[in-house]
Amino acid sequence: MRSSFLVSNPPFLPSLIPRYSSRKSIRRSRERFSFPESLRVSLLHGIRRNIEVAQGVQFDGPIMDRDVNLDDDLVVQVCVTRTLPPALTLELGLESLKEAIDELKTNPPKSSSGVLRFQVAVPPRAKALFWFCSQPTTSDVFPVFFLSKDTVEPSYKSLYVKEPHGVFGIGNAFAFVHSSSVDSNGHSMIKTFLSDESAMVTAYGFPDIEFNKYSTVNSKDGSSYFFVPQIELDEHEEVSILAVTLAWNESLSYTVEQTISSYEKSIFQVSSHFCPNVEDHWFKHLKSSLAKLSVEEIHPLEMEHMGFFTFSGRDQADVKELKSIQSSCQFHCKLSPDVVFSNNMLNRETEVSNFLRDEANINAVWASAIIEECTRLGLTYFCVAPGSRSSHLAIAAANHPLTTCLACFDERSLAFHAIGYAKGSLKPAVIITSSGTAVSNLLPAVVEASEDFLPLLLLTADRPPELQGVGANQAINQINHFGSFVRFFFNLPPPTDLIPVRMVLTTVDSALHWATGSACGPVHLNCPFRDPLDGSPTNWSSNCLNGLDMWMSNAEPFTKYFQVQSHKSDGVTTGQITEILQVIKEAKKGLLLIGAIHTEDEIWASLLLAKELMWPVVADVLSGVRLRKLFKPFVEKLTHVFVDHLDHALFSDSVRNLIEFDVVIQVGSRITSKRVSQMLEKCFPFAYILVDKHPCRHDPSHLVTHRVQSNIVQFANCVLKSRFPWRRSKLHGHLQALDGAIAREMSFQISAESSLTEPYVAHMLSKALTSKSALFIGNSMPIRDVDMYGCSSENSSHVVDMMLSAELPCQWIQVTGNRGASGIDGLLSSATGFAVGCKKRVVCVVGDISFLHDTNGLAILKQRIARKPMTILVINNRGGGIFRLLPIAKKTEPSVLNQYFYTAHDISIENLCLAHGVRYVHVGTKSELEDALFVPSVEEMDCIVEVESSINANAIVHSTLERFARQAAENSLGIVSASSFLHPMIKNVLLCQVSGIQYSQYRVKLCDRPTICSDEFSQFHREGFILSLTLEDGSIGYGEVAPLNSNVENLMDVEGQLQLVLHLMNEAKFSYMLPLLNGSISSWIWSELGITASSIFPSVRCGLEMALLNAMAVRHDSSLLGILHYQKEENGSAQPHSVQICALLDSEGTPLEVAYVARKLVQEGFSAIKLKVGRRVSSVQDALVMQEVRRAVGVQIELRADANCRWTFEEAREFGLLVNSCNLKYIEEPVQNKDDLIRFHEETGLPVALDETLDDFEECPLRMLTKYTHPGIVAVVIKPSVVGGFENAALIARWAQQHGKMAVISAAYESGLGLSAYILFASYLEMENVKASTEQKQGTPPSVAHGLGTYRWLSEDVMMNTLGIFRSPYSGFVEGFIADASRNLKDVKINNDVIVRTSKGIPVRRYELRVDVDGFSHFIRVHDVGENAEGSVALFLHGFLGTGEEWIPIMTGISGSARCISVDIPGHGRSRVQSHASETQTSPTFSMEMIAEALYKLIEQITPGKVTIVGYSMGARIALYMALRFSNKIEGAVVVSGSPGLKDPVARKIRSATDDSKARMMVDNGLYIFIENWYNGGLWKSLRNHPHFSKIAASRLLHGDVPSVAKLLSDLSSGRQPSLWEELEDCDTNISLVFGEKDVKYKQIATRMYREMSKSKKSVNNIIEIVEIPEAGHAVHLESPLRVILALRKFLTRVHNSSTETELSQKLLLALKEM
């Protein structure tokens, strides 16, 4: 017997296993599970060497007992994980891992123990099962196993039907043993655990067994055997992970050399038994491979596996503990040559020889042989059409244990179903039909399969030869019935025992070889039968079975086909491929065109090809990457330029004339877009390289110059090995700019339309898809709409982290359709087949005519065989809507179109569904569609979703979108062309760079109290800031920041944000495309500044946008209007010279007094007046004023009212009824409740305008505005400084204009600078509206009087320039003149008399302070920002690996409230230490006590008073400790993502041991590898999504003394610091607990801390608050600095006020005592 391991005792596993011997399985009752999204382990155990069976390290475990002896020595080993670049194939992934290990051998680890994991992403369907089955039965390496992830009734048959994802593993990296904490002599022992918080390490094993050193297995309660494989392939939906794990421990006599030697045995075996050339058709070999598993399966036994999980349910919140282990009940595991466990993996059916010899007659023998050979070839899915002639084939298929049969009465639908199955499974389905026209009905599907290269096996029954041509029933000529559309035809003779059955088998084998060859396609076997209905026994000679003994003794096909290839063929680049590679290398303007792709391996390869070439990528909707899911950090990256909207861009003549390529590579099949094809024709000649695996000609335009017959994987391999230099052309930047502009425009137009449109369906459909779903698109309009209006979207899948580190920026979505012949027949049936084949949840979208063309497909849908539920969208526009978009529609009579093209109908789809028993849902609105797509059905059932549409409305929508796409393309191209001509591009990207920025605070006098102020307001002045932005060429742009001092923002908070903006904008770069607005500025703010646009105060964003746009205008020698409204010179349309101004009237006084003022305004030249209402005792009084004003000004003057949400509904209704005769243009916000706005209009008839309602939206107002499309809402009043700048204002205005509403720009008492910008912006909106109306032939819209009359309140101005608002000599009305406004903004002259102060940013003073602690001098790096007259000081402490630098942006933001100081905590950054102690103590102990003492002494040097201490993570623990222990010096503490430490002794011991191990890992492997592993943890998921994550991670490398950083990690471990939980309720310091919304762990900790602190306060004035920062994770201050600044400023103010009150109280009390 061989020796083996003693293994662990997981306390959470049942121990009910009886004794058993090897090769026997045990029945255990366990609840079935669903696999988690990720498999992770927290604490594992054991180290011990096995000499013969499975060498490896052993750890204690797999989990520490609750009553562990705390006197034990504890060691925790950290796994170091290295992620390699993604591999093109599984084989190349192995090579990548080999190279990594070879490098490790040349530079072996210096540590005496360790665990290393190398992992690489490989294509998702890497075939773990086949790789496992390829291993030799006499394996030299153990354990070796396969574990299925199938959780729904797994069985041997399900391996064929479902092809489940699974795990293959081999070798033993380490295993786990359970051991007592004392030895036999009672001495304490060293316990060793494995702890990993980031790697995807998984342990596998069995509970309640003892696998001993003699390689025997016994049942033993409390024992278990778990191991981590040395080599592992783990398959997921999105990606597969191939990994190698190595472990060593020299103290247990297992060295690095030994573990590498063991690995080499494992890698040699798996590499030697790996057949890449059969990967494409591995299903042919599955049955024979599974047959090799010769172990007898007696009873089911579940194989346990466990993963890493975070546990926080005990007293402490950061202890990790294993949860209950998930289990699988389909597996095969060889622990040794003699110990094998298996369940649901083996076939226990009767041998083939028996059932063939037992057949009743020769017909049954041949039929059974055909079906058996099909199953051996991997064909297990049979589509059976009922019929007498095919009865023997149907019965044989139905009775075979491995087949899945589907029956349908309609052969046509059945055949299309088989096509769909081939698309999804990549293997043929078998179609069985009777004779006659049943065969003919297959022709449409055969044509589609032939044209789309889909494998299909047709078994058509037939009459025997003697009944042919003699008028026999159902006898037609079936010889070569499908002509050239099949790859192979053979007419079998009628069954007879005179012909060896071998002939039948070789014919089937040959047919499948043709079906799956390089030109895949349908094959046809015609099968004549005599007496097909006679099942009675007849004598037949078994001699026909001669020669089948070997075949009947195994599970392999009779004839196996092999293609001999050189093992070096992929790496050789000779002959023609060398010529092609040279063409690619010399390309200057390359384009990668990705056509239709069926396989995930090829989609994966196309992504890696795009990543290597770095060319612009145009992806067809059927490519799988057109509707990709983007990982958030890559949304703004330039690495992959997918030009998704090239089809839209080509509507523009300018774009068509611009584009030219010198090399185009097309991988995949046909492309959908006709305009892209036309573009290629126009660009020709160029080198056109077409790559496809079939040899057929696919070149309708006759452009292909280089035809490569190869699959995409092979071609990509050649390209990837060549390593081409990257060239980024100017065209590359142009296409990127075009695509971004059009994408934003299409998104806006589709979303802004209130009704449900067909483009909206395509747009939302793409967002609803996930990696676990797939899309089947119907022909005609659906595929064109999805190709044009589908979009990529962000993804948050669990594999994101892996694919990010693997440098793959996106995840694909499997998409298919019937594009071989592009017919509309059989689509529903094809979609159901696709769902069966791909094993995913399929969404299908078809038109109504396509649906009606295949209603028999509902019968197949109803059967729901072997697939997941489907959602089928039927776009019902009552006919063939595509013809309405064709030129013929303009020249043909409507009656002819309706009858012969549209084929209009009134068929009820609902009734059809009802008749077939299929669930039906009707949607007519956007929200209903979203519910149907996004809200999961409680019932797991299929659903037909009918989307109501109309042909004419759809045509109008498409025409409108085409027009706006063309405009967006023209505008963006105009900006790009002008910019690139005037200024050189930075690395071929159009960017400006900021060279300087400053702001000045102003204070101007007003001549009256603003109408926004209360009656108590008596100071007539306006305060704000002027932002000045200088570009690298000296161009200067000005912007105004004018907060209204509301509850949203005030002057002090705004200045804090401005200071941060100044810091972030230093040398920032921005694109010339910002003037396109429509999301471009928001994207830039996030990608360049690293802050979300929604976190910026509206007035700050408005001023920033104003400055940016004005600077760009100056740079281009243009104006704000000129860059917003790009217009070609040859266009010739004159720009407006002015915009009308609406006067503002505060309705104080009697009705006659107000009317008098109104009359004076009319005399001054105002054509419109807005009255403020809602200020009086009752609305009746306001109505009387309005009536009097109307009488005074006459009917020609436009009157508006503004109630500012002051009235109840009843009050507003009363006003509305009284002023109905006053002909008001509108009233703004008449009611307090926004839900009453439409009701108010309906009951009063008074038009309503939105104003304050617009203030409530955040980043996307369109969804909110959808509620206000009612015609009674006639206008939107937009204050740019309130809604957040020009981009948001333009978005709202465009929505309003699109829905026929007025867009009125309104000022908020800005200075002349802001008013000048608003004049130009209002003019831009007017011009856009005129342009849109003209193109829609709606006539010229009336001019709008904009709400800029607040200029009359200005007693003085910020600018010395004359404000260009005066009475026009031409119109006689008061207007804002564009020329004056443009001139003012181009040459701004600041009135220094109103400037209070100017700031170019807060300077940072950097210096060192020395503090002496415990015989060491610590020279602490200090960053000092700001001065505060009142003496407030805030000390900022960074987290582990950080430095004081990371706090500087926030410190600048709150420097106006306090002097801000950050430090490099001892051991970090540039802080250093010098020893004055004995030589034996060369480094200090960085304990909590030592750090706190050092900082305390530092504070004493900084200030004699108290400080508020702000700490993040590790710094937060220090801050809390100091707040509790040094309250005499600390007046407040802000604990950001921090904790009080650990209370549980076991948790403390584990955590300190874990941190010790991490410290050793840092010293042994270096800081770079440590940081790579550190930030792979789940705690940092949100931070990894930040656009500046790479920069943040790089900043963590800037530490001068890495050993000190490592020592601090150990010494300051939360397991060693004093637990502060017991002290919280005695805290007498002001505390603010801050955490991120996404940081679940620290949110729970903060909540618990808050409860503890709130129990008892020592002072009634103490502040205890809890603050949640939206849209942020653990690193709150880095992810959302503006919101942190706001929270800190408020807390510091409260602390200061509280301290002041306390001092006053103490003085008062002292005075009273003295009295």
Curated annotation (Swiss-Prot):
Single annotated GO MF: thiamine pyrophosphate binding
Annotated segments matching region 2-succinyl-6-hydroxy-2,4-cyclohexadiene-1-carboxylate synthase: 1418-1715
GO cellular component labels: chloroplast membrane
Enzyme Commission no: 2.2.1.9, 4.2.1.113, 4.2.99.20
Binding residues annotated for Mg(2+), in chain numbering: D1202, E1228, D1251
Cellular compartments annotated: Plastid, Chloroplast membrane
Extent of the transit peptide: 1-19
Signal peptide: none
Pfam families recorded: Abhydrolase_1, MR_MLE_C, TPP_enzyme_C, TPP_enzyme_M_2, TPP_enzyme_N
Residue span of region Inactive isochorismate synthase: 20-273
Active site per UniProt: K1170, K1279
Protein origin, superkingdom: Eukaryota
GO biological process: amino acid catabolic process; menaquinone biosynthetic process; photosystem I stabilization; phylloquinone biosynthetic process
Keywords: Chloroplast, Lyase, Magnesium, Manganese, Membrane, Metal-binding, Multifunctional enzyme, Plastid, Thiamine pyrophosphate, Transferase, Transit peptide, Transmembrane, Transmembrane helix
Loss of function: phenotype: High chlorophyll fluorescence and lack of phylloquinone.
Topology versus the membrane: Single-pass membrane protein
Ranges where the record places region 2-succinyl-5-enolpyruvyl-6-hydroxy-3-cyclohexene-1-carboxylate synthase: 363-933
InterPro entries: AB_hydrolase_1, AB_hydrolase_fold, DHS-like_NAD/FAD-binding_dom, Enolase-like_C_sf, Enolase-like_N, Enolase_C-like, Mandel_Rmase/mucon_lact_enz_CS, Mandelate_racemase_C
Main location: plastid
Cofactor(s) required, per the database record: Mg(2+); Mn(2+); thiamine diphosphate
Limits of the AB hydrolase-1 domain: 1435-1540
PANTHER family: 2-SUCCINYL-5-ENOLPYRUVYL-6-HYDROXY-3-CYCLOHEXENE-1-CARBOXYLATE SYNTHASE (PTHR42916), PROTEIN PHYLLO, CHLOROPLASTIC (PTHR42916:SF1)
Recorded family membership: In the N-terminal section; belongs to the isochorismate synthase family. In the 2nd section; belongs to the TPP enzyme family. MenD subfamily.
Protein role: Multifunctional enzyme required for phylloquinone (vitamin K1) biosynthesis.
Protein name: Protein PHYLLO, chloroplastic
Gene: PHYLLO
